[in-house]
Amino acid sequence: MHNDKDLSTWQTFRRLWPTIAPFKAGLIVAGVALILNAASDTFMLSLLKPLLDDGFGKTDRSVLMWMPLVVIGLMILRGITSYISSYCISWVSGKVVMTMRRRLFGHMMGMPVSFFDKQSTGTLLSRITYDSEQVASSSSGALITVVREGASIIGLFIMMFYYSWQLSIILIVLAPIVSIAIRVVSKRFRNISKNMQNTMGQVTTSAEQMLKGHKEVLIFGGQEVETKRFDKVSNRMRLQGMKMVSASSISDPIIQLIASLALAFVLYAASFPSVMDSLTAGTITVVFSSMIALMRPLKSLTNVNAQFQRGMAACQTLFTILDSEQEKDEGKRVIERATGDVEFRNVTFTYPGRDVPALRNINLKIPAGKTVALVGRSGSGKSTIASLITRFYDIDEGEILMDGHDLREYTLASLRNQVALVSQNVHLFNDTVANNIAYARTEQYSREQIEEAARMAYAMDFINKMDNGLDTVIGENGVLLSGGQRQRIAIARALLRDSPILILDEATSALDTESERAIQAALDELQKNRTSLVIAHRLSTIEKADEIVVVEDGVIVERGTHNDLLEHRGVYAQLHKMQFGQ
């Protein structure tokens, strides 16, 4: 078991390495800086031997005169190398994290809808944000610890000397000065942390919008828009992180410089005869100092494996997602605009992970330009039929045709470009009204075309009342709009899309009667000259359909016009009686 685990860890790191490799120049610079940093510590302690034996033992005042300058120089070198190593490692880490996040984001946008059916939004957001950040600990924190502390231990074990009680007084002198420095730096930390939290919220929001609006992204071809949006906020987060690292890295050298100045003062004061008489042997001081100095690197090395394993565990989680199969897009047929004929032939479909088919032996033909309505109780399979037209799921048996060709023959982008979707749960993006209407195609449509679509959707009345009209930002998922207003924005989006096939999935079921009347005219306008598949609970909205299909437990049980089905006195007539009491 232990060997298997080690092999798994090594394989994970080997797979992570290609992500780190492009930034290896930063690793090389950091490695050199870390070795110089550890060497400066070791050389600092090595100076205690000539200092105590020659400077104090033989009362050679010249040693005590130049030694403080050497000490200050070494501490400055240590501070500079510490800053360079921390900054370079964090630069590499930030690049690795951003690269992993972008890979995850892009991969998730290509995942099938069934993947999101089985995953919670919070879990996926955690993968993009927190788990990606954890990867940094395996590529940065562990490297810093092993190189710096390892070099320090090797040097310190060579030079063991004792510590003097006089030097311990330095801690008392340094305490108030260091506390002031920490207070100043902490204020800077707080300001940067607030900016980082705000930026992380933007990253999370961008990812959440893509995840919650995954169907809209797919159907409207918004992958590039969402990728650019996410790249922008992700890079902004990286820059904020570098500001935090810069402030953090400079704090240690400042405190160390303060300590070196205090130590230099003690060394200079030691040249006075009254002080020299009270000093012990140099070897005792050096050994004791080395022993104390060894405590920190030993403790760090003890914890480095746990740190490394956390990073590797995060890598394995992310690679599990990256290894998940994306949507199959094997079709070759590309079509500019379909006629709109849609036909289901003996279609059977089962949701992934379930045993009972959601649809069984479905045969349905929707002629171009006609309207077919699907009715039935909740869970009967109506929305499933709509989802199959856009290939959000692939069927088990049978075939679905568009203009006489199997849907699987078309490229996904070409197929979904033929379909406009208006559902009960409208997803709007935290953007302007205009950009929501022209989603993923803002450069393709003119301002006049956007306004015309909004007018035809009876949306300009409330849009004109907004502070900035079409340029008003509507908040996350259109939080500033009512249900009816959000639906009209969605209808305007579908009108502007001008696709030959229209799916209305419970488009008015969540609205009150007044709101439904307000958008019914817009829906009628939208359905003109389009192949329409309407899913509705309210039977009053589909009475004019060319054909009404009744679905029960995944099977078509009735079909016909409104009047024909009422005369048949079957399931549709019962549903109609339940709603209208007739």
Swiss-Prot record:
InterPro entries: AAA+_ATPase, ABC1_TM_dom, ABC1_TM_sf, ABC_transporter-like_ATP-bd, ABC_transporter-like_CS, ABC_transpr_lipidA, P-loop_NTPase, Type_1_exporter. It catalyses: ATP + H2O + lipid A-core oligosaccharideSide 1 = ADP + phosphate + lipid A-core oligosaccharideSide 2. Its EC number is 7.5.2.6. Residues 342-578 form the ABC transporter domain. GO terms for cellular component: plasma membrane. Signal peptide: none annotated. The keyword Translocase applies. Its main location: membrane. It is a multi-pass membrane protein. It is an enzyme of class 7 (translocase). ATP binds at residues 376-383. It is found in: Cell inner membrane. SUPFAM superfamilies: ABC transporter transmembrane region, P-loop containing nucleoside triphosphate hydrolases. Residues 28-310 form the ABC transmembrane type-1 domain. Involved in lipopolysaccharide (LPS) biosynthesis. Translocates lipid A-core from the inner to the outer leaflet of the inner membrane. Transmembrane domains (TMD) form a pore in the inner membrane and the ATP-binding domain (NBD) is responsible for energy generation. In MsbA the ATP-binding domain (NBD) and the transmembrane domain (TMD) are fused. Homodimer. This is ATP-dependent lipid A-core flippase. It comes from Escherichia coli O6:H1 (strain CFT073 / ATCC 700928 / UPEC).
